[in-house]
C-alpha cells in the first residue's frame, strides 16, 4: 500500500530516522563544517505539478558541497559540445573514494566521472576557459533555478577548504601533467571550493533540481536549462556515480538518481515526477548522510517510487 505525499508523511519519516544522526560523524576534515550541529534534519519535495512539501529543518541553509558538481556539469553542458566534455572526463563509476589519486594515475589523468573530485575539477577547468566570471555565473544560475536571489557562498567554508586543499591541488597538478588541465590550478581550485560552499536549504535544493525531473525544464523559467537528452544523461550519471563508492548500495536501497555532499545534503530525482532534498550532517564511511539515505529509502517505499 502506497501513501499520499504530504507534510505529515515527511515529518513521520524524519522521526523514524532521527536516531541515525547519533551514529554518523559530521565532516571534520573541513574545519568550518565541523561546527554544524549533528542533530539537524530536514526534507523537502517539489513535484513537476507545482506542489512542494517539507518537514524538519527544511528551510535552514547549509553547505551543499559535492551536490554542486551536478550544477557545474549542467553549466558546462550549455557551453561545450558533448564530445568536448566526455573526451576529458568519463561516464563510469569509480569504485574509489572521491578524492583518490591512484585511479587517476593509472588512467592517464582522465577522471572516471564528473562527480568525483578529479572529474569536478576538470569541469571547473572547462568553465574557467569559457566564462569570464565563473563564480558569479554559478550564483546567477542557482538563484534563477530556486527563485532565491539571496543565495550566497559561505566564504568561511570556501576559505577553510582552500586552506586544506593539498590533495585536491595534487589531483589538479596530476591531471595537468597528463595535459587534461589547462588553467591556473589555484584559480580553478578557488572556483571549485566556492561552488562547494554554496549555502542552500532543502526547500531551495528541491526547487533548483526540479528541472532534472522535468526533462530539463524548470517550471518557472521560460527557456530549458538543458535538453531532455542531457537531463536523462545527468540522471544516469547520478544513478551510477552520485553517491561515491556507495552508489550501488543507494540504487539498491532507494532506487533513484541521487547526489550527495559531505555537508550532509542529498538530492534525489524521480524523473517526470519530483525532486527531493534531504539534510542530516552526520555521515557514513563514504561521506553520505546516514539519516538522509534512510529517509529517502523510507520515502521511496511509502510512495512506491523507483526508477527500477
From Swiss-Prot:
Subunit: Homotetramer.
EC supergroup of this enzyme: hydrolase
Protein name (record): Glutaminase
Keyword Chaperone set for record: no
Pfam families listed in its UniProt record: Glutaminase
A GO biological process held by the record: glutamine catabolic process
NCBIfam families: Gln_ase, PRK00971.1-1, PRK00971.1-2
Residues at which substrate binds: 66, 117, 161, 168, 192, 244, 262
Upper lineage: Bacteria, Pseudomonadati, Pseudomonadota, Gammaproteobacteria, Enterobacterales
Organism: Cronobacter sakazakii (strain ATCC BAA-894) (Enterobacter sakazakii)
Homology family: Belongs to the glutaminase family.
Keyword vocabulary terms for this entry: Hydrolase
Keyword Transferase attached: no
EC numbers on record: 3.5.1.2
GO molecular function: glutaminase activity
Gene: glsA
Catalytic activity: L-glutamine + H2O = L-glutamate + NH4(+)
Amino acid at each position: 500500500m502506497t501513501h499520499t505525499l504530504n507534510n505529515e508523511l515527511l515529518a513521520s519519516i524524519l522521526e523514524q530516522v532521527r536516531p541515525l544522526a547519533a551514529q554518523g560523524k559530521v565532516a571534520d576534515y573541513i574545519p568550518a563544517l565541523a561546527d554544524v550541529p549533528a542533530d539537524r534534519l530536514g526534507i523537502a519535495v517539489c513535484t513537476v505539478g507545482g506542489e512542494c512539501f517539507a518537514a524538519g529543518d527544511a528551510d535552514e541553509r547549509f553547505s551543499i558541497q559535492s551536490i554542486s558538481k551536478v550544477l557545474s556539469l549542467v553549466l558546462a553542458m550549455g557551453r561545450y559540445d558533448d564530445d568536448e566534455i566526455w573526451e576529458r572526463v568519463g561516464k563510469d563509476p569509480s569504485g574509489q573514494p572521491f578524492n583518490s589519486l591512484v585511479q587517476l594515475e593509472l588512467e592517464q589523468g582522465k577522471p572516471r566521472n564528473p562527480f568525483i573530485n578529479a572529474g569536478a575539477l576538470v569541469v571547473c577547468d572547462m568553465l574557467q576557459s569559457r566564462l569570464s566570471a565563473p563564480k558569479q555565473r554559478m550564483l546567477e544560475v542557482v538563484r534563477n533555478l530556486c527563485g532565491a536571489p539571496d543565495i550566497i557562498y559561505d566564504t568561511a567554508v570556501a576559505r577553510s577548504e582552500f586552506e586544506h586543499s593539498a590533495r585536491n591541488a595534487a589531483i589538479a597538478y596530476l591531471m595537468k601533467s597528463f595535459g587534461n588541465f589547462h588553467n591556473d590550478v589555484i584559480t580553478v581550485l578557488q572556483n571549485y571550493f566556492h561552488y562547494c560552499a554554496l549555502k542552500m536549504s532543502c526547500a531551495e535544493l528541491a526547487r533548483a533540481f526540479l528541472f532534472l525531473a522535468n526533462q530539463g525544464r524548470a517550471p518557472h523559467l521560460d527557456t530549458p536549462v538543458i535538453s531532455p537528452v542531457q537531463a536523462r544523461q545527468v540522471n544516469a550519471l547520478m544513478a551510477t556515480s552520485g553517491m561515491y563508492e556507495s552508489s550501488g548500495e543507494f540504487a539498491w536501497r532507494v532506487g533513484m538518481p541521487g547526489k550527495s555532499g559531505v555537508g550532509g545534503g542529498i538530492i534525489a530525482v524521480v524523473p517526470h515526477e519530483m525532486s527531493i532534498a534531504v539534510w542530516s550532517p552526520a555521515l557514513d564511511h563514504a561521506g553520505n548522510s546516514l539519516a538522509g539515505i534512510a529517509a529517502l529509502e523510507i520515502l521511496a517505499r511509502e510512495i512506491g517510487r523507483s526508477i527500477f
